[in-house]
Amino acid sequence: RDLHKEYRRQRQMCIRDSLPIGHNQTISQPYIVAYMTEQLQVEKHQKVLEIGTGSGYQAAILAELANNVFTIEIIPELAEGAEKVLNKTGYDNITVRTGDGYKGWPDQAPFDRIMVTAAPEEIPEKLVQQLANDGRMIIPVGANLFMQYLWLIKKDKDGIVKKEKILPVRFVPMVKE
């Protein structure tokens, strides 16, 4: 798909810095987008929840890998902009909604994979509850911009949850309604 035509900063997509997308938000560094996507181990038959739609770029990547992507953005203007771009580029397996990511998307749960692209102070229990058995969630966590870590949450086939701290990161804070 021709995402680069819609996400015009093609040269900047190779740098190691986050990029501003308006409303005091950023798109993650390209290597973090790739790393988080790889850690999720998304398969084609799966249903994915993304918290923090932003520009829609990460949702588009997930949609190339998964059957269905549901993405929530708390800032209405970003959600609307992302939805326009995603529709224009032919992504019919992505559903965009404006809302509070802390609540997840209960009427579409459970999700095989959950990706969170903004940092809450703690892992939201509602998101863990919406993770399917044999599911994986990747989430940056930390109140202080300089003390955040990326966590990989795995729920086994019996519903037992294991949490692994994997990498120091810097993300915008996750916002509640």
Q: How should these model regions be labeled?
A:
Residues 1-15:
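Single conserved hydrophobic/aromatic residue that forms the stacking wall/gate
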Residues 7, 26-29, 33, 55, ...:
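Short, conserved glycine- and acidic-residue-centered signature motifs
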Residues 150-177:
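Substrate-binding/catalytic lobe of Class I Rossmann-like enzymes that use SAM or dcSAM, i.e.
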